[in-house]
């Protein structure tokens, strides 16, 4: 993009397609240019070179009126909206069709109600916008974009201010909407784990290597994901297709058991620098039992046993042993 004194090149050599009926997530570090790319794709700012085709037509050939009925945009900004009902805000999505006075026709009102129903916020429709939580407000903005009836919707970090359950709900909602409406939905996000589990396609944006695209699984198999996030302390687990913390282990302990208790003990020990699994050979070992048992058994080097009721007590045992 152009600034007053220079031209800033954010990314080049992008050759990719965003498809209808799919949720595509744009991932990248802070400052890499995700928002700039979204603004360019939305025609909010001019591209420096190349072409952007929307439904087979160059974006520069669209009039403002045509763009308003082709591309809907949901931004991160938290606007303070007062004295407006949710239904009225969703109705503003119909502004490209209502003319100067903005009066909703019977058909416009039907589309507004359908958009509210698609996002499942019927119980919020008569609430004042300023009384909503961040998650509820984000749903309303998505409903507004749906009411705009554009085949393409761009979202700039729609989960940025949400708690984890709300993040999951918004991501699942967007994925559901791509299937239900066959719209093209493209969003930037920092929620890596959710994007890998829910999105259909991923765009990895990196200053050094440009943009890599594909399904999360293909990017995992090709090594793009592990290379993209390669840094100390983070490891891409090829078995799960997700990232995990790369703990540095100071000792190893054999762990016997199965199910949830085994997994939770293993996780707690690894967080505390102890590699624990069934394959490890050690003089001391831990028996986790299953959910029917209420304790954990530590088999000591001396041949004796030490029983703990909680994982916290189990960790304290090894802290005491170290000291």
Model-found features: residue ranges?
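Conserved ABC ATPase "signature" region
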Residues: 91, 106-124
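Catalytic Walker B motif of ABC-type/P-loop ATPase nucleotide-binding domains
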Residues: 153-157
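The feature captures the beta-strand-to-loop junction immediately N-terminal to the Walker
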Residues: 27-29
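Conserved ABC transporter NBD signature motif
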Residues: 50-58, 67
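Helix-to-loop junction immediately C-terminal to a conserved catalytic motif
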Residues: 42
